[in-house]
Amino acid sequence: MTEIIIRPCTSADADRLSIVAAATFIETYAGIVDGDDLVAHCHVTHAPSAYAGLLADPGKRLFLATLDPGAAPVGFMLMGEPDLPVETGPDDMELTRIYALHRFHGVGLGPRLMQTAIDTARTAGKRRLLLAVYSRNERANAFYRKMGFRQVGTRLFHVGVNDYQDWVLALDLQGTGLGRA
């Protein structure tokens, strides 16, 4: 029997994060973003050295989802202080990335990662969880709506020579629903 384990990342997880991040980014944006731009973006943004830097940053929180037995990486999430073009305050935290390999969509991994994010933010005393999502990523947007997020702004996300419109979403951690303990 296989089981998905979600655990805090360690400094040894940079390669695992890099692999699952690049794979999920390509799975999601192939056919939307130019192939050369995808590869260049992943080469920089999802390089092991980029994740080593994030893992060394005390302001970042990373969790890895692995398949047991074997501990193959199948998803992860990254959180930290907000860096979004909306008004934020000390009670806010940003869920910068929440990625799962497509094979693991629909098996409860997304809600488990989201609950981990909510619990992490609440434990840190945060009252609102923010994230940005590509406006045309219908599956992700439906998931976030189901989780209780609402749109509070927009931003442009630059990949290669193109800009893509993201929606900035927020979840009130003091309200009802999943954000509630």
Predicted regions and their residues:
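C-terminal "cap" of GNAT-fold acetyltransferases
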Residues: 3, 63, 89-93, 127-141, ...
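Acetyl-CoA-dependent GNAT
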Residues: 4, 8-14, 18-33, 37-103, ...
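Active-site acidic-Proline motif in GNAT/NAT acetyltransferases
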Residues: 101-103, 107, 135-136
